[in-house]
């Protein structure tokens, strides 16, 4: 057995072991602290996202108007329930039910299974919502990290950014950073996504950081590491409106719609690269601190 402690309290659930500490909040709806040798990796808890910053092609095709509900659906989602299950003396699972801020109030589940090795499994599930709803721009989580964790090494399609409809890339291990991955478009927009990722390491200059890998039997995921959140990119009209980076923003996605671009302005995304709202989606990744 691993030398560690699992503490199930009224407000929080804590797991300690191997120099790592995991703190899951009942009231705040998820992971509120994740440390390794006192290095903190959570500035804001990983939050459900159903949105991506509009691209020039999105704007030209009217996607903002058509998909406005998804901008707020994840951002204003509320936690309506939680369930704590102690699996054994070294493992605990915290499951949260979120209600998306849509007229349908679709329920999304987010669960963390943590053990005393300090590893955490993160599972996010969208059940699909029947009805005539606009397609979803993206689904997964966005996580705010301290600014020093700006280096990215990943095993996936690369080395440049890739999307469902932009995959002229090779599968391999690639190294980049959040600043290189931020394309300075005249009008800020979605940028820096990587598809078909098996694992990714987000580190500081000393190599300390976070490792994300697809769980056993799970599909590869999409991800990006940026010095700006998707909402900061969406709000800015020009690059000079973006502030000096104070945090890093990690997006880990089950799926993201394509970006289109058969021409330079009004070319919509082809139907096969949309995400139907009635399509169930899940994301299953393992987290570890390095």
What are these regions (language model features)?
Residues 1-290:
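Beta-strand/loop-rich accessory regions of lumenal/periplasmic or secreted enzymes
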């Amino acid at each position: 057995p691993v030398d560690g402690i699992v503490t199930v309290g009224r407000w929080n659930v804590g797991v300690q072991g191997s120099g790592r500490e995991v703190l899951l909040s009942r009231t705040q709806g998820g992971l509120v602290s994740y440390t390794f040798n006192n290095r903190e990796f959570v500035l804001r808890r990983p939050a459900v996202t159903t949105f991506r910053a509009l691209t020039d092609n999105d704007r030209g095709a009217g996607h903002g108007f058509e998909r406005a509900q998804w901008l707020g659906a994840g951002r204003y989602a509320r936690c309506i329930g939680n369930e704590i299950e102690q699996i054994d003396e070294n493992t605990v699972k915290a499951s949260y039910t979120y209600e998306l801020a849509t007229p349908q109030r679709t329920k999304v589940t987010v669960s963390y299974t943590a053990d005393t090795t300090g590893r955490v499994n993160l599972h996010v599930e969208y059940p699909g919502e029947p009805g005539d709803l606009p397609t979803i721009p993206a689904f997964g989580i966005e996580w705010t990290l301290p600014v020093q964790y700006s280096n990215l090494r990943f095993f996936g399609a690369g080395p440049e950014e890739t999307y469902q409809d932009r995959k002229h890339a090779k599968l391999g291990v690639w190294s980049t950073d959040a600043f290189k991955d931020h394309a300075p478009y005249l009008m800020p927009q979605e940028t820096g996504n990587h598809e078909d990722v098996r694992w990714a390491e987000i580190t500081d200059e000393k190599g300390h950081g976070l490792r994300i890998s697809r769980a056993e039997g799970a599909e590869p995921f999409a991800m990006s590491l940026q010095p700006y959140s998707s909402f900061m990119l969406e709000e800015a009209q020009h690059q000079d409106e973006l502030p000096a980076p104070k945090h890093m923003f990690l997006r880990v996605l089950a799926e993201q719609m394509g970006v289109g671009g058969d021409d330079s302005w009004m070319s919509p995304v082809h139907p096969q690269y949309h995400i139907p709202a009635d399509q169930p989606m899940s994301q299953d990744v393992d987290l570890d601190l390095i």
